[in-house]
Amino acid sequence: MSEKKEIKNKINCISNTKKITKAMEMVSIAKMKKSEIKMKSRKPYLDIIKTIISHILYNHIKYRHLYLNNRKTKKIGIIVISTDRGLCGSLNISLFKKIIQLINIYKNKNVMSSLFILGSKGVSYFKSSTYDITYYEKIITKNYTFFDCLNFIHSSLEYYNTQKIDKLFLSYNQFKNTLVYIPVIMQLLPLSKKIFKGNKNSHWDYIYESNSGILLDTLLNDYIESQIYQSILENCTCEQASRMISMKQATDNSEDLIKKLRILYNKARQDNITQELTEIISGANAVSLY
């Protein structure tokens, strides 16, 4: 009887867990769709800025900006886009391992690294080791807007602008589809003029008033800020997709476990019935002997 009760309690406990994981799966689906729409809606804006910069640079070949100038690398900075919450599979760990590889590559060249981390998971991971965390922030709002992340972006860029670091990398999870997301590390600064090539031959009839150099300064800043924010949106979409899959797997595993426990419960129940029948028959036989 105690075995049946124990199995029944396990079934009830797992059923309650299954309800939670199923609810979290549905919430993640809704959040992922919302985040994906936001991510895709920002992409054309980034492409347009890139196109405008391409045309201006094409007409100002000798123009040099702080973000276009290469300098001797003494120290690098890495912007780490992580999550505030867990239960999203190996999303963070895969990215962190790639970041550590980059740090070690530059360490072998006697180049130190500074980390600018967004998300509490990244902070807790790198704080447990001896890595230099220069600046960090948590994602404090559910709907993380462009203006919410400006303080983090400006704090990171300030170190490059004041030449405290000579290269700035951006690390995040790139969203491909619901099942595929890739940990990516890209060099954010200095920018290569190669990334702005490809659009210069298209039709263009804008007139810049008055100084295109001033406009280019503004656009380059806007491009960098938008690039970082785009990576934040992609990482958020990856987070929800990964959590959705993790919760679906947990729900499916719960269902499988419940099925196995029900088989055990029915078997224990049948054993009890068989034992009771055996006892009744044995008792009846004993009475008939008298």
From Swiss-Prot:
* Protein topology in the membrane: Peripheral membrane protein
Cited SUPFAM superfamilies: ATP synthase (F1-ATPase), gamma subunit
Instruction: Tell me which InterPro entries the record gives.
Output: ATP_synth_F1_ATPase_gsu, ATP_synth_F1_gsu, ATP_synth_F1_gsu_CS
Give a GO cellular-component term. plasma membrane
Give a yes or no for keyword Isomerase in this entry.
no
Q: Which Gene3D superfamilies match?
A: 3.40.1380.10, ATP synthase, gamma subunit, helix hairpin domain
Question: In the UniProt record, does the keyword Cell membrane occur?
Answer: yes
List the Gene Ontology MF annotations in alphabetical order: ATP binding; proton-transporting ATP synthase activity, rotational mechanism
Compartmental location: Cell membrane
Q: Name one GO biological process term.
A: proton motive force-driven plasma membrane ATP synthesis
The record's keywords, sorted A to Z, are:
ATP synthesis, Cell membrane, CF(1), Hydrogen ion transport, Ion transport, Membrane, Transport
Primary localization class, coarse: membrane
Function of the molecule: Produces ATP from ADP in the presence of a proton gradient across the membrane. The gamma chain is believed to be important in regulating ATPase activity and the flow of protons through the CF(0) complex.
Q: How does it assemble?
A: F-type ATPases have 2 components, CF(1) - the catalytic core - and CF(0) - the membrane proton channel. CF(1) has five subunits: alpha(3), beta(3), gamma(1), delta(1), epsilon(1). CF(0) has three main subunits: a, b and c.
The record's annotation in PANTHER family points to:
ATP SYNTHASE GAMMA CHAIN (PTHR11693), ATP SYNTHASE SUBUNIT GAMMA, MITOCHONDRIAL (PTHR11693:SF22)
Q: Which family does it belong to?
A: Belongs to the ATPase gamma chain family.
Q: Give the NCBIfam families listed for this entry.
A: ATPsyn_F1gamma
Q: What is this protein called?
A: ATP synthase gamma chain
Q: What is the lineage of its organism?
A: Bacteria, Pseudomonadati, Pseudomonadota, Gammaproteobacteria, Enterobacterales
| Gene name linked to the record | atpG
